[in-house]
Amino acid sequence: NNALRLVHQFFRKSDGGPLPESEKRILENVQQVVNDVLSNKDVMYNLVEVKSYDDYTYFHSVNVGILAGIIGMKCKLDRATIEDLVTAAFLHDIGKIFIDIEIIHAPRRLNDQERIRMMEHPRLGYELLEKNFRFPESVNRTVLEHHEWYNGLGYPNHRGGNDLLFTSRVLKAADVYDAMTSKRPYHPPYLPSEVMEYIMGRSGMEFDPAIVEVMSRSMCVYPVGCEVELSN
């Protein structure tokens, strides 16, 4: 399935073969975190809301949750922070339920008016979670900040660098990676190597260099079918 594909890409197993034991342990830990997060009825409620509105956004949110958890593990974040990160990743696009479905499914690039409306979804999601649920503020803020750029040129509040939560910076990278490697109405899926080239090329601008470094050491940056020898 798509989530398994992401895992093998991350650990450079382009052939889909068994993962190394060290990486299996990371994946097992992430699975435990995911299970714990999904046991929260408020998380499940919001995921069901997303799925009932748009299937792609739902599956994208699940993929990003798994991917963000793996990156968080690789960044050696503590368990509580990873739980907050995965929770925010599952919920990061909840604000899209307030965006017209015609905009969500537009088979083309959005016009200026549509793009401005779409850019409201982080704030809309943050406000929904703040008003109606009791998630930690770090979760809500990570949802709010997931389209901010490291250099401060993102949205909605033009924050950058250490003014952003580290979890927001991880989520930003995981979100872009899954979106670009997924088939969309307006573009085919890019190869993992192409996406990593894009992310590495925007290190220090769109993405936190420390997170890019972790991803570049871990993710598949070689064409599908190319065998890579893992270093000890």
Describe each PLM feature range.
Residues 3-232:
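Histidine- and acidic-residue-rich, metal-dependent catalytic cores
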